[in-house]
């Protein structure tokens, strides 16, 4: 049943070759999100391992992590914490820079979004290099969070981001894998 559910989810993801540049296959989850059954299955699958447990906050990475993370937080009766690109949050923040293929970027979180000891799940749509997710885990830990898991709809295992998080001691849950970049 679980394998069939994840196969149907995988079929709901649109693959766009040579976007944003030649040689890349973009995995577009907007088709999954727009299909009520697929969206529900994805959220239910992300929630299932943590239902009935104590999760204080769900942190979502901008932008699709907001959609998924908000739905997960709602089902877990947890709070939701946005992790945004620098300059997008109105209150006092802490931030961290991380490497991109060409240059760096920076994400931030409100300083009062997490209380020390909060049990937090990190949610995003896809893990590739793990750069943004690693930076998010570091921010959450800096504020005293216990990062229970990092959850993604899609993993691109050849790129190694999920393993990078595991090397930091983070449990990683994904719903499907795609080969390539």
Swiss-Prot record:
Pathway in which the depicted protein is active: Purine metabolism; AMP biosynthesis via salvage pathway; AMP from adenine: step 1/1
Biological source species: Methylorubrum extorquens (strain PA1)
PROSITE patterns in the record: PUR_PYR_PR_TRANSFER
Cell compartments where the protein resides: Cytoplasm
Enzyme class: transferase
Keywords recorded for this protein, A-Z: Cytoplasm, Glycosyltransferase, Purine salvage, Transferase
EC number of this enzyme: 2.4.2.7
Role, per record: Catalyzes a salvage reaction resulting in the formation of AMP, that is energically less costly than de novo synthesis.
Quaternary structure (record): Homodimer.
Family label: Belongs to the purine/pyrimidine phosphoribosyltransferase family.
NCBIfam families tied to this protein: apt (TIGR01090), PRK02304.1-3 (NF002634), PRK02304.1-5 (NF002636)
Catalytic reactions of this protein: AMP + diphosphate = 5-phospho-alpha-D-ribose 1-diphosphate + adenine
GO molecular function: adenine binding; adenine phosphoribosyltransferase activity; AMP binding
Pfam families from the UniProt entry: Pribosyltran
One GO term of the biological process aspect: purine ribonucleoside salvage
Protein's UniProt name: Adenine phosphoribosyltransferase
GO cellular component, one term: cytoplasm
């Amino acid at each position: 049943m679980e394998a069939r559910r994840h196969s149907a989810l995988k079929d709901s993801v649109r693959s766009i070759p040579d976007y944003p540049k030649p040689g890349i296959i973009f995995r577009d989850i907007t088709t999954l999100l727009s299909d009520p059954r697929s969206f529900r299955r994805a959220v239910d699958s992300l929630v299932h391992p943590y239902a009935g447990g104590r999760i204080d906050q769900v942190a979502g990475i901008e932008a699709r992590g907001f959609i998924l993370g908000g739905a997960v937080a709602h089902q877990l009766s947890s709070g939701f914490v946005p992790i945004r690109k620098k300059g997008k949050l109105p209150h006092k923040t802490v931030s961290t820079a991380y490497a991109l293929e060409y240059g760096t970027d920076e994400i931030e979180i409100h300083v009062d979004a997490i209380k020390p000891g909060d049990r937090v799940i990190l949610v995003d749509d896809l893990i590739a290099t793990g750069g943004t997710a690693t930076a998010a885990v570091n921010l959450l830990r800096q504020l005293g969070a216990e990062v229970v898991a990092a959850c993604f709809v899609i993993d691109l295992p050849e790129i190694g981001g999920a393993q990078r998080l595991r090397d930091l001691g983070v449990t990683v849950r994904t719903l499907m894998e795609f080969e390539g970049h």
